[in-house]
Amino acid sequence: MLFRSKRDPAQYGTVTLAEIDAQLIALGKELGAEVECFQTNIEGEIAERIHRAHSDGTAAVLINAGAWTHYSYGIRDALAILKCPIIEIHMSNIHAREAFRHHSVIAPIAKGQIAGFGADSYLLALRAAVSAAQQA
């Protein structure tokens, strides 16, 4: 997400990560949920943040793992220890793109996957996560 502006706007739109984060925080307040946004290009940092979620009372995790979706067993294994709902997010429809993007190592352990709605994928995922956490 850090270099979204350098990627194909037809796939990812033109909204910035800061704008998505602000929309998530605002929607979280509306839904009565505290939202923490985290972004890194370092796989180990994602795994460490996920491990922290295991012990800090995180009620749900939204994750857009980008290309790591297709091959990162480290991120998958970190997510697998969580007891809270996990929602996998993709701005583009990964199932309508190149064949190598169709497979997700995260999907089998996620509560659900939201893809193809651009930046709205994040907002839809937050609504789903809040609902799932309330039912858990």
Predicted feature descriptions by range:
Residues 1-2:
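Short, small-residue-biased leader/transition segments that mark boundaries at the very start
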